[in-house]
């Protein structure tokens, strides 16, 4: 079966529907309803965390999914689909894309990213792989490893990029990413206004993922409260 994800989301908004255990909306049911709202608004796809959330969302909407699994391992800073175990579990849901950390940091159990990619290509040949990158160097690593999609997800969230924002200097970093790879780039991370989303698309991004600015009411409310 041909994966039609890239055609479906081109030039569009993907909404990330995630809530971690310490957040008020942590519930697979709530995430499924959030996805329904996203679909109603016109989102072209959903990004979701954990097998149970992915399955609940699949039961609710027919939008294509970017799936991932956030797991904390004690001896590794990598937490987005960090090992082959999580990669397999997410891919087994049938989601169109599996996203994982590509930040060059050591993975749990000494696993190697190149081996994970090779295994996924053999076991799930129809599943697209998205690299959640943080730096130009790691964009190039992901490109060389053959990831289908390059994401800017981790820019600003790793020790090497602390404090960075995708919108800095008129999106200078994003422009570099687009120059560094010919693969589809999905902008993600701190894209918190419609204007920033549009700018990412105008610069040449294939699609844009927006999460917290839409689906995390605690964070949204805090922005208003902090202005008082």
PLM segments and residue spans:
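C-terminal binding/interaction regions
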Residues: 205
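Active-site-adjacent beta->alpha loops and helix N-cap segments on the catalytic face
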Residues: 24-28, 47-66, 77-85, 102-120, ...
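Conserved hydrophobic beta-strand within the GNAT/NAT acetyltransferase core sheet
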Residues: 48, 129-131, 185-189
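Conserved N-terminal beta1-alpha1 strand-loop-helix module at the mouth
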Residues: 1-92, 123, 129, 137-149
